[in-house]
Amino acid sequence: MPLYESSHEMDLTTVSLMHPDAADWFAKRTSAWRDWPLADLYDRKGDTRISVVLPALDEEPTVAEIVTGARTLMPLVDEVIVVDSGSVDRTAEVARQAGATVHHRDDILPGTGSRPGKGEVLWKALAVATGDILVYVDADLTDFRPHFVTGLLGPLLDDPATQMVKAFYDRPLLDVSAGGGGRVTELAARPLLNAYFPALAGVVQPLAGEYAARRSLLESLPFAAGYGVETGLLIDTYRTAGLDAVAQVDLGQRTHGHQDTAALGRMAATILHTIHARVTPGAPVWPTLTQFVRRTGTVTPADHPVAHPDRPPMTTIPGYQRPLA
């Protein structure tokens, strides 16, 4: 696997507080989309079948452009599927006109019923997608490029031991630093993963909606029904297949629709529940938070101690007396 440029520039003193497994993983399992030329992927595809899957809810303005872009990769990509989770706009119609195979969530495995949430749609997609590899792409992207797919496929087609590939990218938001994650990532998912699953601290954007995985892996894992699905799959892949089964790829820049603070609060609560359900009771808490900064075209870890001991109650301090007025 090609070495990500920042692994050569990394200041070892910067990562000394990072969990050693995470630091080692970041250095050897991170690459950039340019490391995976399209011609090389065609050579490595063989008889591997590849499905691009878009979960969609009211994404009429953006879904057709993404479908069209993904279809330019045929025959590397064998099918583009949109799973509609109950849109009230023309999402299904415009996706079908753009060439996607469209399924409604409620029509897939009807005997299981339908639950609300993104994870439900991704789970049901397994019952209609025919690929050996599934590439999930959010349907609200406003700047989709075909390399979003090819970058994620690269590590999977290069190494049979790779089971899941996560994307990371710049997010051009005024209140989000370049190279970091979104607000829910920085305020909820990253601190919790660093604390309870520190070996995953090297994952730049654990909530990225763009990722690819082998069907054999996805079929063996539970799917959180809501917005905790990405976090749950990441943790469960790590536990089931090991840290080196996961890779990540820098896709450059990504823009998409944004939600208000109240909606993000609900998302954060769902993710907290998903992570808490996977924490071993009594597990130690890692004392460092690893964040990421964009420098000269690459992303570099920045570590911060966060476990600061409490001061004791003042009444336990020898010689303490309340000052007189």
Put a short name on every predicted segment.
Residues D78, A92-E120, V128:
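Conserved donor nucleotide-binding strand/loop of the catalytic core
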